[in-house]
């Protein structure tokens, strides 16, 4: 029988760290990563045949659950017509129309193949549109692995960026200003001093890469205000939150209109897709209409468009997001109550179909320093306890969890019963 330990050792001989994305290696929790053989509905199945209730959902895209039959049918039909053409298709226009209709802040949208491509291109576009170089990002927000965004935060209200990954030139990082997430005063201060030099703010409207941290009241509004006053471009990175926290994304949920939006994950229905779009006057700076260059061999891939279009059609059904949010609330509140009953300090954040678990005495977690102060060792033990119980959570204390339409209340209650047993041993 195949086992994950043997397969991981073999993978490490040919793939750096044995994985194609670092978080999958279980470095944040220890142990050997689970090698998955297949997935269906709310479950992933290891190579040993064990079923796990899955709250990773391929890191967000699988909002309908795995292997949804209607999505698979759409994909099969597209595959029968060919895998890639390198030419315009009806499907990519249909996707653009659908996305623009669901997100009114988008007058035009360009398809790419990953979230990193989307954020990288949006920043280049903002710089080209404004003629400015500096960008603002926030501690704990991840926007892909392009050089401008691999910059760590230091202390104080403003950090002139230092590279946090070898290979990022220091002079490039100096154009990235890093501020504390949810700190409106720091935003106003940096714009008072550098507003005329700043091309854009890029922000996860719900920070999903330091677990799940929603914006505090007034924070997103401040970003909109300072961009309006300075002429900077406001970019919402909705690669994770787009079509996940609400049908119109976090911008619809919170009622804030960005200038540009980046998308991914859900819009691909499990296939590699990204997108960026926004105001007409900005988007028309893109080649071939304008001078800001962006291109991609597989952008708008017809198979990926088929998966994404069917997914967007299904999640647009009435009450879909109301029901998803209620399921997430049921899980989040159930975990909090059971932890409290076991004497375990746990803060649970959730928005739409996202949730985050923080082992901390703090009543609310809204800042990066609070996230970093949480008990990571207790999370590690909780993760492995749940894995033994057949529940697959994100293998990192800094990643959000996801609920899908396939998670019915019986599945959620099985998860809560498992958590009750694990909490008792923590």
Curated annotation (Swiss-Prot):
Which BP terms from GO are recorded? Answer: protoporphyrinogen IX biosynthetic process
Query: Which superkingdom does the taxonomy of this entry point to?
Result: Bacteria
Q: Which GO terms describe its molecular function?
A: glutamate-1-semialdehyde 2,1-aminomutase activity; pyridoxal phosphate binding; transaminase activity
What is the enzyme's class at the highest EC level? isomerase
A Pfam family this protein belongs to? Aminotran_3
- Enzyme Commission (EC) number: 5.4.3.8
A Gene Ontology cellular component where this protein is annotated is: cytoplasm
Q: Which residues cross the membrane?
A: none
* UniProt-listed InterPro entries: 4pyrrol_synth_GluAld_NH2Trfase, Aminotrans_3, Aminotrans_3_PPA_site, PyrdxlP-dep_Trfase, PyrdxlP-dep_Trfase_major, PyrdxlP-dep_Trfase_small
Names of the cofactor(s): pyridoxal 5'-phosphate
Reactions catalysed, semicolon-separated, are: (S)-4-amino-5-oxopentanoate = 5-aminolevulinate
Read off the CDD domains from this record: OAT_like (cd00610)
The record's note on quaternary structure and interaction partners says: Homodimer.
Q: What is this protein called?
A: Glutamate-1-semialdehyde 2,1-aminomutase
């Amino acid at each position: 029988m195949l086992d994950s330990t043997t397969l991981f050792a073999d993978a490490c001989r040919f793939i750096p760290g044995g994985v194609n994305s670092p978080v999958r290696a279980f470095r944040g929790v220890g142990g050997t990563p689970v090698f998955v053989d297949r997935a269906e509905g709310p479950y992933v199945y290891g190579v040993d045949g064990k079923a796990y209730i899955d709250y990773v959902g391929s890191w967000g895209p699988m909002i309908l659950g795995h292997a949804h039959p209607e999505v698979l049918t759409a994909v099969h039909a597209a595959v029968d017509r060919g895998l890639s053409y390198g030419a315009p298709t009806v499907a990519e226009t249909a996707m653009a129309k659908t996305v623009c209709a669901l997100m009114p802040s988008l007058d035009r949208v360009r398809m790419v193949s990953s979230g990193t491509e989307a954020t990288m291109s949006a920043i280049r576009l903002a710089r080209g549109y404004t003629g400015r170089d500096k960008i603002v990002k926030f501690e704990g927000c991840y926007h892909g692995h392009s050089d401008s965004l691999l910059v760590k935060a230091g202390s104080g209200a403003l950090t002139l960026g230092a590279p946090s990954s070898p290979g990022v030139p220091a002079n490039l990082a100096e154009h990235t200003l890093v501020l504390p997430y949810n700190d409106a005063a720091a935003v106003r201060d940096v714009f008072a001093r550098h507003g005329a030099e700043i091309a854009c703010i890029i922000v996860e409207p719900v920070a999903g890469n330091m677990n799940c941290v929603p914006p505090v009241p007034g924070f997103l509004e401040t970003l909109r205000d300072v961009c309006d006053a300075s002429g900077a471009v406001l970019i919402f990175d909705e690669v994770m939150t787009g079509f996940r926290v609400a049908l119109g994304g976090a911008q619809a949920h919170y009622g804030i209109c960005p200038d540009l939006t980046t998308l991914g994950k859900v819009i691909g229905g499990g296939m590699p897709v990204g997108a960026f779009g926004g105001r007409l006057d900005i988007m028309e700076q893109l080649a071939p209409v304008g001078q800001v260059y962006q291109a991609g061999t597989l952008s708008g891939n017809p198979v990926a468009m088929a998966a994404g279009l069917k997914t967007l059609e299904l999640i647009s059904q009435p009450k879909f997001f109301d029901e998803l949010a209620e399921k997430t609330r049921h899980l989040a509140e159930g975990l909090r109550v059971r932890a409290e009953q076991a004497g375990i300090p746990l803060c649970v954040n959730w928005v739409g179909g996202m949730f985050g678990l923080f082992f901390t005495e703090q009543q609310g977690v809204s800042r990066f320093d609070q996230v970093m102060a949480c008990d990571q060792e207790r999370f590690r033990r909780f993760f492995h306890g749940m894995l033994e119980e057949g529940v697959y959570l994100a293998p990192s204390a800094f990643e959000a969890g996801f609920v899908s339409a396939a998670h019915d209340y019986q599945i959620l209650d099985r998860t809560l019963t498992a958590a009750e047993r694990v909490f008792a041993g923590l």
